[in-house]
């Protein structure tokens, strides 16, 4: 079993890379891919860069060059659930684009043409993540809808508009749905795991800078615990 792991920023992958053994590195199109062992599993970790295009490029290259059996997207997110605090975790129950609108052609809001409205993570990856929750200590984790768009959300007016379209949204970020869409195209199972760095409000720019390292660590910890729970035979 080989697992691809993608984070957008250095703090979101640094703890994973530091914990790897037998690591080798290859750079393609300016993106570094680090292959090795993590939590007893063969993994390939990469920092994609920020946004949906960067994430799509990195995901496609990782799948084409390394043929992973599953993909994990890790990192930070803005939170929309009152019971979660900064540093807590959202495991994707589904992933959607929040900034796509081709409803004029009969699609749902957030649904890209010729794509599903929601991308559903692999059950065995979500199951492994849920088993890992018990080992998180004081860090809380829930399953929920994660929405993706090419904007950092810190405007309450925009937040309310997003919640009108996606009332069950638990978190928003800038890469997950793009990674999920590429995985859907290639038939690669995926899950998105995000730790909250802010609450998608006016304080978000300050909170993000203050808490990105904490969020990156918690998300990386969750990924490593997930890998420990993952059954090598439970793929595809």
Swiss-Prot record:
Protein family membership: Belongs to the PNP/UDP phosphorylase family. MtnN subfamily.
Q: Where does substrate bind?
A: 78, 153, 174-175
Q: Which GO terms describe its cellular component?
A: cytosol
Q: Which gene encodes it?
A: mtnN
Q: Which CDD domains match?
A: MTAN (cd09008)
Report if keyword Plastid is assigned: no
**What EC number(s) would the UniProt record show?**
3.2.2.9
Name of this chain's protein = 5'-methylthioadenosine/S-adenosylhomocysteine nucleosidase
Task: Output the InterPro entries linked to this UniProt entry.
Answer: MTA_SAH_Nsdase, Nucleoside_phosphorylase_d, Nucleoside_phosphorylase_sf
So where's the catalytic machinery, residue-wise?
12, 198
Known catalytic reactions:
S-adenosyl-L-homocysteine + H2O = S-(5-deoxy-D-ribos-5-yl)-L-homocysteine + adenine; S-methyl-5'-thioadenosine + H2O = 5-(methylsulfanyl)-D-ribose + adenine; 5'-deoxyadenosine + H2O = 5-deoxy-D-ribose + adenine
| SUPFAM superfamilies attached to this UniProt entry | Purine and uridine phosphorylases
Part of which pathway?
Amino-acid biosynthesis; L-methionine biosynthesis via salvage pathway; S-methyl-5-thio-alpha-D-ribose 1-phosphate from S-methyl-5'-thioadenosine (hydrolase route): step 1/2
Spell out the molecular function terms from Gene Ontology: adenosylhomocysteine nucleosidase activity; methylthioadenosine nucleosidase activity
């Amino acid at each position: 079993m080989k697992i691809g792991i993608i984070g957008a920023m250095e703090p979101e992958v640094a703890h994973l890379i530091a914990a790897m053994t037998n690591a080798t590195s290859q750079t393609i199109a300016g993106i570094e891919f680090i292959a090795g062992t993590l939590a007893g599993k063969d993994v390939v970790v990469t920092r994609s860069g920020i946004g949906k295009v960067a994430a799509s490029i990195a995901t496609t290259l990782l799948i084409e060059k390394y043929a992973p059996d599953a993909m994990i997207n890790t990192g930070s997110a803005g939170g929309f659930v009152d019971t979660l605090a900064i540093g807590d975790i959202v495991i994707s129950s589904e992933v959607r684009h929040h900034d796509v609108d081709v409803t004029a052609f009969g699609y749902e809001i957030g649904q890209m043409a010729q794509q599903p409205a929601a991308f559903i993570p692999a059950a065995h990856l979500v199951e492994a993540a849920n088993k890992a929750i018990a080992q998180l200590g004081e860090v809380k984790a829930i399953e929920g809808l994660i929405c993706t768009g090419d904007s950092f959300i810190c405007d309450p007016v925009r937040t309310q508009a997003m919640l009108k379209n996606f009332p069950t949204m638990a978190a928003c970020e800038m890469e997950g749905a793009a990674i999920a869409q590429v995985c859907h195209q290639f038939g690669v199972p995926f899950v998105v795991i995000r730790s909250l760095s802010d609450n998608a409000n006016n304080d978000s720019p300050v909170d993000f800078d203050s808490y990105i390292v904490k969020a990156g660590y918690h998300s990386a910890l969750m990924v490593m615990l997930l890998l420990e729970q993952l059954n090598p035979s439970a793929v595809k």
